[in-house]
Structure formats: C-alpha cells, structure tokens
A protein has these predicted regions:
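Catalytic and substrate-binding regions of cell-wall glycan-acting enzymes that process beta-1,4-linked
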Residues: 374-445
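Periplasmic-binding protein-like
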Residues: 45-48, 120-133, 200-242, 263-271, ...
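Export/targeting segments at the very N-terminus of extracytoplasmic proteins
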Residues: 262-310, 343-346, 360-361
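Substrate-binding/active-site groove segments that recognize
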Residues: 313-337, 342-355, 439
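A ligand-binding cleft/hinge motif common to bilobed small-molecule-binding domains
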Residues: 87, 103-113, 160-165, 186-221, ...
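Extended ligand-binding regions for polar small-molecule ligands
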Residues: 20-26, 64-73, 132-154, 200-202, ...
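Bilobed "Venus flytrap"/periplasmic-binding protein-like clamshell domains
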Residues: 42-51, 56-72, 106, 127-179, ...
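Extracytoplasmic small-molecule ligand-binding "clamshell" domains
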Residues: 21-105, 109, 113, 172-179, ...
C-alpha cells in the first residue's frame, strides 16, 4: 500500500513540461468579460509541430487549430504569442500576458503550478526517441543509458519512476538550455544525443520530419493533455470546457486528428528502387513537365520523393496533398485537387516553383537561387527574407544559401534573434535548412546514377 501511495504521489506531482513559476507571485484576475472588452483571446505557446507553427505561409498546429475553432465560436480574434523560454509560460499567464497556455501539457495537480487545466483534448503515452538501426527494444535496456530531457518535465519524472519501479540505473541528463521537446528530437536525429522522451502524439509527427528516428518504445500509460488557464478565469474555463467536451466528439475533431496524426505520408511504402533505365515511377511525367522550364527533371523528382515518396494520393500534416504536397489553398489557386492526375499536379507544381524562382531573381548564382526557391517553398518567403536580413546582420552573405542564409534560418528558433526588429515573421523552427539539404542529397544521388 505504501508503494502504491508513493506511486500516486509521483504521478500527481508531474509538473508541466518546464513551465516553472514562483509560487509567491500573484496572478492578475482576468476572465472572459475583460477578454471580451479587450477584443481578442491571447494564446501563449511554443513554436513546435504540435502546438503552433507556420508552414508555407499558413498558421498550423493541432492545438492552434482547436483554439482557433474555439475563438471563432466566441467571436474573438485569436492572437498567438510564441514563448521561447518554456519556464516562463506560467509566469506570463499569471501576469496577464496571455489567457491560455497551449504547449502539449500533461495534466497534473493544479496546485503544483497554481493554474487550472481544461478538460483534456487528447491523451498520449510517453515514448522513447532514438535513432533507427541499433535501437533498444525494452525499458530494461535503458539501464546505464544516457537520456536527455527537459528540466522538471513529466519526462524526467517518468524516467525517475522507471528507475525505482524496475531497478535500473538511467543516466538522466537535464538539458540546461531550456529546449522544447522537438529540439531534443532533432539532436537525436542528428546523432548529437542518443535518447530523449516525448509524448507519442508529437513523436508521430516528428518521425515524418526527422527520417532517422524511431518512436516505437512506449514508456508510460496514456497521459491526459490539456490547456492551462489562470485560476481567476472561471468563465473562460467553463466555456472552453463546454466547447472541448463537444468538439472532441465531432467529425471536425476526427478530421483534425487524421490530418496531424494519421496522414498517409507516414505510411508510404519503401522508397522506389531505381531500375535500369528508370530512376522513378514517373520519369516520363517529370521529363515532360520541365520542358522549356530550365529545370532539371531529376530535381523535380527529388522534390517529389522528399514530399511524398512518389505517392500522388499522399495526405500530409495540415491537409497538404499530392505528389509534391500542395496546401489546400495553394492547390485551389493552381486549379488542382487530391483527385488531379500526377501530370496535372506536376504541371501546377512547376508553375509554382517557377513563380517562386522569379521572386529570387536577385540571387546571381543559379544553384543558390534554386536553394532559396526550395527553402521558401518549404517555409514561406517571409521567413526566408527574415533569414536574409539576419544573415546580413551576422556578417553573412544574404545572397548565398549554403553556410550563410542557411545558418541564419536556423537561428530563427532562438528568441535572441526572432525578436529582433528586422525579423518580421517571428519564430521559425528552421526546417527549411534540412529540407534543402535533403533534396540536394537525393538530387545528387540521381545525377550520380545517370
């Protein structure tokens, strides 16, 4: 019985993921009436693939889309504040700088953080993030392994509990720079650390962004995930709970889950194996589409492999579709839909890429211009222009992608940089750097096979 009580205490004392605060701080009393007078609902969040991000100039994120639907129902504009230091989320909430925390929060005892949790919007177990290949297959294999986690996170507490529960010695390392979980996943993918822990919902998204990771080892039972609110926001909590309890049973929520967690890109077959005289399943289509465009068909093929693995029926995160993953609004602009033929999709893609290429006509070197085009296709032009301005400030060349703007775009995840006045579009995860690099790896491989 004593062991069971210790277990319950360890579970309930799971804190919000790095959202620490000073318990002596008094919170501002702000509820729905004042929010309505202010005329907007403010969400404090992280720049992550699950909570909030911008992709191809569209605001996305599983939690963002839930709260966007809620705000529309309340007839309130939604304002997003990205907080780079996750340990400040609760402080900013209590200070009245935002009304809701959206950061994939595990539900814990409210008095641990002195905030309230909404009704859960999802539940997800914790899983081990490791690289493919020499992976471990059981929790016992974590003995003597080094696992990096966020300070005071539910992941740290879970690993400590596993040590006591099954008698193993895990070398738990707290990453001092206050990263978000996705930063640690990226470090695993790059081989800089071997293991970290994440909730399975974020891990499912991440394994399609980071090709080297495995997320199959489950470390816990499903944990409830919710939004965080001030204690004083009684009416806001009542309205949001009512909305969530209805929304999670709706077809709209079912479709939202499909778009983020069950999309087909993650279940594509093994990469097409080039055969003699044929590099891809659609060589002739690629060759036909690039005629008179100045583009190498192998480069367009590399984009298609990276985007969909040559699957014209692929559906991606946020609703993207097709062989080169058009966002729905962009597809409508270019006259295509998920039912369009491969050649129609490629023709539209070529028009889009050629138009984007024209936007970068001040880049003198053609290869570099192509890389800027690919980067803006992935991230949206605004983030890449931010990276150019930042590159200039850092004494890098704003007209060269390799080792210059490429470096600057990675710095846009850091608040020391994305809060600079020259940065117009805010925080960005930096995925464009990896996107461009991967496409050129595929492209160079195709050229070597010629």
């Amino acid at each position: 019985m004593l062991i069971f009580r210790v277990f319950l205490i360890s579970v309930f004392l799971v804190v919000l993921q790095s959202c620490s605060y000073n318990p002596d701080e008094k919170e501002k009393s702000i509820d729905l009436d004042e929010i309505n007078r202010r005329g907007k609902l403010i969400v404090l969040t992280e720049n992550s693939s699950l909570s909030y991000y911008e992709y191809r100039e569209k605001k996305l994120g599983f939690e963002y889309e839930i709260l966007d639907s809620f705000a529309k129902k309340m007839n309130l504009p939604l304002e997003i504040k990205v907080v780079s230091e996750s340990d400040k989320l609760v402080k900013y909430l209590k200070d009245g700088e935002g009304d809701i925390i959206a950061a994939n929060l595990s539900v814990s005892l409210s008095n641990v953080q002195d905030i309230k949790f909404t009704s859960p919007h999802y539940s997800s177990p914790q899983v081990l993030i490791q690289r493919k290949g020499k992976k471990i297959n059981s929790v016992q294999d974590l003995d003597k392994k080094t696992v990096y986690v966020r300070k005071n996170s539910s992941f740290q507490k879970r690993l400590e509990y596993l040590e006591d529960e099954i008698g193993i010695d895990i070398n738990i390392k707290v990453y001092e720079e206050d990263p978000i979980t996705e930063d640690l996943i990226e470090l695993v993918d790059e081989g800089k650390i071997d293991f970290t822990v994440a909730h399975e919902n974020l891990a499912r998204i991440s394994k399609d962004l980071y090709e080297n990771i495995d997320v199959s080892l489950v470390l816990s039972f499903p944990q409830k995930l919710a939004f965080g609110l001030r204690n004083s926001s009684v009416d806001l909590k009542s309205k949001l709970d009512q909305f969530l309890n209805e929304y999670i049973r709706s077809e709209a929520f079912t479709q939202l889950k499909r778009r983020y967690f069950d999309y087909a890109v993650s279940e594509l077959p093994v990469n097409f194996i080039p055969k003699k005289g044929k590099l891809t399943p659609f060589d002739k289509s690629f060759q036909n589409v690039v005629k008179n465009s100045g583009w190498d068909w192998k480069l367009l093929a590399a984009i298609a492999q990276k985007e969909s693995n040559f699957n014209p029926q692929a559906r991606g995160m946020g609703g993207s579709f097709g062989i080169i993953q058009f966002m729905p609004a962009t597809g409508r602009k270019y006259g295509i839909s998920p039912s369009s033929s491969v050649e129609q999709q490629l023709i539209a893609g070529m028009k889009l890429l050629s138009s984007s290429m024209d936007d970068w006509n001040k880049i003198p070197d053609m290869t570099q211009r192509v890389k800027f085009t690919l980067a803006s296709y992935n991230a949206g032009r605004c983030h890449i222009e931010d990276a150019q301005r930042l590159a200039k400030k850092l004494n890098l060349n704003p007209l060269i992608w390799d080792g210059n703007v490429e470096k600057a775009v990675l710095k846009l995840r850091n608040s020391n940089y994305y809060r600079l006045p020259i940065v117009k579009c805010g925080a960005y995860r930096g995925h464009a750097a990896f996107y461009v690099r991967r496409i050129f790896e595929i492209y160079n491989g195709y050229k070597a096979m010629n």
